[in-house]
Amino acid sequence: MTGFLPEPLRMLVTSPALLDFTSDGPLPYALRQKFTGKPPPVTSNLSLASQTVLVTGATSGVGLEAARQLAQLGPRLLILGVRNASKAEQIKSELERDTPNLTVQVAELDLESLLSVDRFVDELSANSIRLDLALLNAGFFAHDDRITDDGYSPLFQVNFLSTAYLTLKLLPLLHTTAPPHPPGTTTPPGPRLVLVTSEAHAWTTFPDVPRPTENRTQPILSVFQDKNTLGSADDQYARAKLLLALFGKELSRRLTAAENDTTVVITTPGFCASNFFPDGMMTRLIQLTSARSVQQGGALHVFAATAPGPEIHGAYLRDGKPTGLSKFAQGPQGQILQERLWGEMEEFFMQRGGSPLGM
């Protein structure tokens, strides 16, 4: 019945949370898009001078716009982690032409491949890159029944697994002393990691979450390896974004406990008029009537990347304001899922040769 509907309308009307009329629900979300989302102003005299900034998924849409806006803040080096390197080279030329003294580096990063993630971080390490800001924006949506070479649904691997794995591999490059900032300017304190989730995380739950004392018959990650348990593309996307938000929350908690000065921010730009969803006349009409501009979405990313204050650490920003994750995520089952997920990701990381996280 709903197969003819374009995205994101299909995602909205097929959501189990359709009749949730709290701010978490899909209908209040749709109504908010045109009336909220104006980002708070950036800090006066904000400068990223002498800083190294990484943006993934920066060849189009909100990611590209965020890269452009961050470039205007004058970082020493802007790294674009992208799947399409040839397109990124054109963007590099444009950014360097429009922004004096900016150096842009293009590095290939395909989140459908864990090996590509390894190579990407190895390249950064080999070049002695120290990151001040990592904006992990890359995402993916398609009605796609493929399984990647790593054995996972592409929707899950790109939107959660590879992004979380990249996060863990980048931590040693972020946990370093930040450079001094120019006199008369303000620089965000300490290194920062921004994880881009989606309000769709609130439109799903996770099946069969056991209590901590119970044995789990199927690991969380394996749910996304079996076509019989994947669910629809809409649900895969929502669950991947739910897991990413929970991962970010647990990471921020553990970094604080370990006295690591890296700030973690979880954010969403909302629905923006980009090419994220498959193109079509109805999709374009929905974008025209309901979507935010990519400039708004990019500005929300920049705010998440630069907003000052200790309260920003571990925050989930919606419409540029700290708010709670979904009721499920904050409830007892969500907390169990968060704890289980961290354990699985820590084991996954070490199985791929990562050092014990010590957090």
Curated annotation (Swiss-Prot):
At the top of the EC hierarchy, this enzyme's class is oxidoreductase
According to UniProt, this protein's pathway is: Antifungal biosynthesis
Keywords per UniProt? NADP, Oxidoreductase
Q: Which residues bind NADP(+)?
A: 87, 110, 137, 237, 241
Where does the record place a coiled coil? Answer: none
One term of GO molecular function: oxidoreductase activity
Which residues act catalytically here?
A: 237 (proton donor), 241 (lowers pka of active site tyr)
Q: Which Pfam families match?
A: adh_short
EC numbers listed for it are 1.1.1.-
InterPro entries in the record, alphabetically?
NAD(P)-bd_dom_sf, SDR_fam
Report which superkingdom the organism of origin falls in.
Answer: Eukaryota
Its annotated function is as follows: Short chain dehydrogenase; part of the gene cluster that mediates the biosynthesis of the tetrahydropyranyl antifungal agent restricticin that acts as an inhibitor of CYP51 and blocks the ergosterol biosynthesis. The highly reducing polyketide synthase resH, the short chain dehydrogenase resG, the cyclase resF, the FAD-dependent monooxygenase resA and the enoylreductase resD are required to generate the first stable intermediate desmethylrestrictinol.
Hey, which family's this protein in? Answer: Belongs to the short-chain dehydrogenases/reductases (SDR) family.
- Protein name as catalogued: Short chain dehydrogenase resG
